[in-house]
UniProtKB/Swiss-Prot annotation:
HAMAP family: IspD. Keywords: Isoprene biosynthesis, Nucleotidyltransferase, Transferase. The record marks 20, 27 as: Transition state stabilizer. Catalyzes the formation of 4-diphosphocytidyl-2-C-methyl-D-erythritol from CTP and 2-C-methyl-D-erythritol 4-phosphate (MEP). GO terms for biological process: isopentenyl diphosphate biosynthetic process, methylerythritol 4-phosphate pathway. This is 2-C-methyl-D-erythritol 4-phosphate cytidylyltransferase. It comes from Escherichia coli O17:K52:H18 (strain UMN026 / ExPEC). SUPFAM superfamilies: Nucleotide-diphospho-sugar transferases (SSF53448). Pathway: Isoprenoid biosynthesis; isopentenyl diphosphate biosynthesis via DXP pathway; isopentenyl diphosphate from 1-deoxy-D-xylulose 5-phosphate: step 2/6. It is an enzyme of class 2 (transferase). Homodimer.
Amino acid sequence: MATTHLDVCAVVPAAGFGRRMQTECPKQYLSIGNQTILEHSVHALLAHPRVKRVVIAISPGDSRFAQLPLANHPQITVVDGGDERADSVLAGLKAAGDAQWVLVHDAARPCLHQDDLARLLTLSETSRTGGILAAPVRDTMKRAEPGKNAIAHTVDRNGLWHALTPQFFPRELLHDCLTRALNEGATITDEASALEYCGFHPQLVEGRADNIKVTRPEDLALAEFYLTRTIHQENT
């Protein structure tokens, strides 16, 4: 089937290990309910009708993915990821076919809301550079003194946002910006930072703060609570 300008391919970098979780199992393969975190994250993407394919970049030699139902899903493509997130995303982009726009979503961010995703996807009609889901900073922010656990000063939180995923960009633009940034040794912490490095200004689309990334052991119980609450709300 030919791809239309409205069709979107999602890329999920899932080659990381997540040492802060303090488990032998990579965090994306930990379970919440009867599914892994990765499955929750991918199913949230596929629930939107514009997302026609999901490319998952896994670590070479990963034996866990093949045991999941996702391995046989007709809309899933699997590629080998790289040592760094940006390498995995580039590998995913190369497998994204002729999709004009791509979503990049964290493998360990299972609590994505469909209305947030829908608002983000409207950027393909209104923006040339795309944007990201993000949440305004509401806590008081402190900057530490270099090398010390001591407060240097309070940071003005006005205009500060927590970057979330998915992040949504024209495929060719993201590919070119990631390639240039990596070739020039820039520090790339997310896909938006590659566009920033190349002089672009992606938009911020406000999303829910409960769209958390499972990073530490305590995040697992919190994500389970959020998912259970969401399922209950959708069924009532």
